[in-house]
């Protein structure tokens, strides 16, 4: 199992003022400019400004899941680009509706909002542990 030594500053599922009534991803406490990379192979289905998410990238993974990387300061990929594990997607930031620098990471079963699953469990199932 690969371990990434990052602190989770906001866990998945916490009740709050988000549109879904709970936090639909995890927030990772990283500094502005931290490299953000794909966790596996897939295709970029969205890249650029995404409203409250600020600058964001969504990757449809080969397993059919959609991974959202949000509040980026910079985006380095374009819609339609093929990615693999380690492809540089952009840099973390504080764009959109954000209270401070972090990476918001979300896993969805469908492309649209409201089909989220626990991203920590998804990563663990794919050999990655946060913390």
Task: Name each region found by the language model.
Residues 21-23, 39-76, 101:
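Zn2+-dependent peptidoglycan hydrolase active-site motif and core
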Residues 35-45, 77-92:
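Short, well-structured beta-strand-loop connectors
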Residues 1-53, 131:
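Surface-exposed, glycine-biased beta-strand/turn segments
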Residues 9, 29, 60, 70-73, ...:
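Residue-level detector of conserved, well-ordered beta-strand and adjacent loop positions
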Residues 7-9, 27, 58, 68, ...:
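Soluble periplasmic/extracytoplasmic beta-strand elements of cell-envelope proteins
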Residues 13, 33, 62-64, 110, ...:
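Solvent-exposed coil/turn segments that connect beta secondary-structure elements
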Residues 60, 81-131:
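Conserved, short, structured surface segments that act as functional micro-motifs
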Residues 11, 47-48, 75, 92-95:
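Residue-level recognition of beta-strand microenvironments
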């Amino acid at each position: 199992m690969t371990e990434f030594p990052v602190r989770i500053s906001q866990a998945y599922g916490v009740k709050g003022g988000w549109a879904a009534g709970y936090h639909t991803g995890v927030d990772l406490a990283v500094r502005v400019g931290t490299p953000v990379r794909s966790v596996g192979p897939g295709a970029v289905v969205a890249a650029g400004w995404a409203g409250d998410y600020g600058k964001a990238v969504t990757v449809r993974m080969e397993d059919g899941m959609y991974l959202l990387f949000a509040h980026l300061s910079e985006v380095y990929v374009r819609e339609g680009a093929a990615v693999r594990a380690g492809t540089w997607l952009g840099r973390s930031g504080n764009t959109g509706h954000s209270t401070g620098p972090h990476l918001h990471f979300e896993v969805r079963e469908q492309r649209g909002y409201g089909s989220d699953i626990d991203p920590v469990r998804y990563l663990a199932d794919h050999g990655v542990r946060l913390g």
